[in-house]
């Protein structure tokens, strides 16, 4: 039974969540800062506002209607983004800490800033 695929898709652990501020660290949009709009855990990708803009040419659906050119944000791989501190203006990896009340929070390693 070697090589049999599982029926359930694998979901990868994401280091970013919706609403996080991130900086693109590689690719065409390297250096851009934006907010994560959507996460796609099955493919380990994220959609970042105003990053990886694509154009789509849409054909007219009805007679007499004109075609359109739409722009949208395409997903990029989560390994190509890094958390960004707005206060310090620096990108950083994250770590996890327990607070006094027992909550596990995400912390930027370079600045010590608590994310959530």
Curated annotation (Swiss-Prot):
CDD domains: KOW_RPL26. Belongs to the universal ribosomal protein uL24 family. One of two assembly initiator proteins, it binds directly to the 5'-end of the 23S rRNA, where it nucleates assembly of the 50S subunit. One of the proteins that surrounds the polypeptide exit tunnel on the outside of the subunit. One of its GO terms (biological process) is translation. It comes from the Bacteria. Keywords: Ribonucleoprotein, Ribosomal protein, RNA-binding, rRNA-binding. It holds the Pfam family ribosomal_L24. Gene3D superfamilies: 2.30.30.30. This is Large ribosomal subunit protein uL24. Coiled coil: none annotated. One of its GO terms (molecular function) is structural constituent of ribosome. Part of the 50S ribosomal subunit. Residues 1-27 are annotated as: Disordered. GO terms for cellular component: ribonucleoprotein complex; ribosome.
């Amino acid at each position: 039974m070697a090589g049999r695929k599982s029926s359930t898709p694998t979901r990868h652990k994401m280091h970013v969540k919706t609403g996080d501020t991130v900086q693109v660290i590689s690719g065409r949009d390297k250096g851009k800062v934006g907010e994560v709009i959507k996460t796609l855990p099955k493919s380990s990708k994220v959609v970042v506002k105003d990053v990886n803009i694509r154009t789509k040419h849409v054909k007219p659906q009805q007679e007499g209607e004109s075609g359109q050119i739409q722009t949208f944000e395409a997903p990029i791989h989560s390994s190509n983004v890094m958390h960004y501190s707005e206060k310090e203006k620096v990108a950083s990896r994250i770590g996890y800490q327990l607070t006094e009340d027992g909550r596990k929070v995400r912390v930027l390693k370079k600045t010590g800033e608590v994310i959530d």
